[in-house]
Amino acid sequence: MFTSGKVLPTKIQPPLLRPMAYRVLSKKYGLSIKSDGLAALSDFIGSTFGMDWKRNPDTIKFLEVFATVWKQQERGLFVDSTGVKDVINELKEREKATLQESQNMASIPPKTKTYNNGGGKTTTIDRFLTKRPSPSDNDEGPLDQSIDDIPVSQATQIDEEELPMAQEISDQISSPARDQTPEEEFDNRILNWRDYFRIINTTDQKKFSYNPVKRQIFYQPPKDQLKSVLKIPNAQAKTDLFRTRYFLTRDRLLRNESFQSSHDTFNPLSSMIQLKNNINNNNQDDTPTGLSITQIKNLLGRDGQNFLILGVLKMNPKGQWSLEDASGSIDIDISQTLPSPGLFYIPGAIVLAEGIYYTVGHTFAVTSMTFPPGERRDKTLDHIGNLDLLGIHGTEKSSYIPRLDNEIKIRLHLLEQDLTHQKFVLLGGDLFLDDQHVMDGLKKVFTKLDQEAPTVIVLFGSFSSFPVHAAMSSKNISSTTEYKNNFDSLAEMLSQFENIINHTHVVLIPGPHDPWVSLCSLGANGSLPQSSIPTHFSKRMNKICKNITWASNPTRIAYLSQEIVLFRDNFLELCKRHQILFPVVESKRAEDLAELEEQMANNSIDDTTILVDRIISEKQQLPAKVLESRKVVKTLLDQGHLSPFVDSIRPISWDMDHTLTLYPIPSTLILADMSSAAYDLTYNGCKTINPGKFIHKRQARYIQFQPYLKSVSQEEVFF
């Protein structure tokens, strides 16, 4: 389109282009053209299509392609100059990639093919491409004589019996290049699942920034080499850490049906109850609720009015709870707050707070509080234009981000159906290699798995029972030397299982006791993300295992059409330690407990049994482990972040916060939480798995996971 030949550039006045642009962009595609956008289009069309731009059919074709890409990227209704430049750059990148692929295909040398004409004579393709010697060949002539200047008498002569053969070869050479495009050749290619299977550490994950004004995601190229080596984030990364997470959550919330009603029927005293009912009933109630969010800066001077605020819950320097959004912060009063159950309210969580604003003291009295409702993965991908955020289907550039083609997604789903035999094995956490009890359990498990080697085996740390630091152990050797010897022992054990080391991809994810974060934290929760185990300890393992990845924490696996997140963290322990206790809830719990004790003290044994049965029948008494696991999963996925805490609780590397974001939520989240029991839950289409601890008494536990069916089976091996 952009290389149609030599043209004479011209300067087109925007009013001259307006009728054509109106017919194509406005009437056909429903776009509204701004004056600066029309000027940018005029400059490009004048320099590309020249003086004959009105009569050139490529001009109309360009405008149609431009409008199609604009609609695909969901850039909005108004065509401005910035968007015009971005779309034109993307079109150029696409054409450049297509031309490069065509040139690569054209540069493939033709293969020599042998033909038999049926009469016993064998003829090769080289015979038709080589001119037969003739008496005139000995005559001297100019060396630069072209093939068009050769007389017919000097041209290559072909026998009559070889004419059908020559026609066949000519058709085979010319037809594919003429009739089949590179896209069609890609569609006809058989997909190899290994091309769409990749383990992505945090250092390899692509970084994207979010523009809240345009509501678009942009690719951020890596930093220069000096800053990458120093690994020093700048101050801008600190401010973007909160803003990006807040705006992503806000835009996700505004896409919810409860916030898209045009009816101005906002009733703050019942909005939280209505929102909760809509979430529980999957938005089956069509009654408009008219929910709207108010920025904190707009509360000034509006004393005694009801509002709904979206902000980060944290404690201010005065020791009071406050809410903070992009416009400011305000102190809150939670003495009469009724929170939605089934969630962990922790410092750093983004919450929806409903209440009354008082000018005196600039305080917001919260009456109810909940989390922003979650969103399914497919809906989020549709909103962002099916961007390939993992970089599996193409290479990112500053002006171009590859997308997930719908046809490729369907083909990958079909390929998953043919790979139902593939499975992932998730060994429980705390694989202490310095514990002989653990090593015996590993040997038993590997013996069983070697009979039918899985596709992936994931080993979760910590791999040492004590933090690895610069100190001498009880054996008068350094802890680092002992740590290395433990991995050498593991490598020696794996060498006995040929199927595993040859056909299985081994993934090792560090824990809080593993270097080098253990030098600073001494076993406590360190900063995230955590880098992989250093290569100094992995040399022997790399020699034994053909496919091994020393992963970071967290890490991501791209498996065909799915995204799997692996994360090792004691999340439940942190939530229990730092959750906010609301006075109304605690007082109600204390009253119920006191009333129950009083009734049991005043009743006989028979009456007590009846009383307990009545209490159990009135309340849905689920096991505490089930309730805790549900709260953990809902808290993580609704927050859209693996560490929704403030920096004082869980530090985060400022420039690596994008590796902890769950936007969109993954297909599967594997959370190795040693402070919680093993579980597997599905919430908003995301399968969440916790393998639990590896050793339980004399049992070695692990989980088999089939990605296609998302089926989980817990296995136990006694030893």
Swiss-Prot record:
Keywords, A to Z, come to: DNA replication, DNA-binding, Nucleus
Report any Pfam family annotated for this entry.
DNA_pol_E_B
Name of the protein in its database record: DNA polymerase epsilon subunit B
For region Disordered, the annotated ranges are: 107-147
This chain's function reads: As accessory component of the DNA polymerase epsilon (DNA polymerase II) participates in chromosomal DNA replication.
Q: Give the gene that encodes this protein.
A: DPB2
Molecular function as annotated in GO: DNA polymerase processivity factor activity; DNA-directed DNA polymerase activity; double-stranded DNA binding; single-stranded DNA binding
One cellular component term from this protein's GO annotations in UniProt: epsilon DNA polymerase complex
GO terms (BP aspect): DNA-templated DNA replication maintenance of fidelity; error-prone translesion synthesis
- Note whether Membrane occurs among the keywords: no
Q: Any remaining note in the record?
A: In eukaryotes there are five DNA polymerases: alpha, beta, gamma, delta, and epsilon which are responsible for different reactions of DNA synthesis.
Top-rank taxon of the source lineage equals: Eukaryota
**What is the scientific name of the source organism?**
Candida glabrata (strain ATCC 2001 / BCRC 20586 / JCM 3761 / NBRC 0622 / NRRL Y-65 / CBS 138) (Yeast)
Assembly information from the UniProt record: Heterotetramer. Consists of four subunits: POL2, DPB2, DPB3 and DPB4.
InterPro entries the record matches: DNA_pol_a/d/e_bsu (IPR007185), POLE2 (IPR016266)
Q: Which family does it belong to?
A: Belongs to the DNA polymerase epsilon subunit B family.
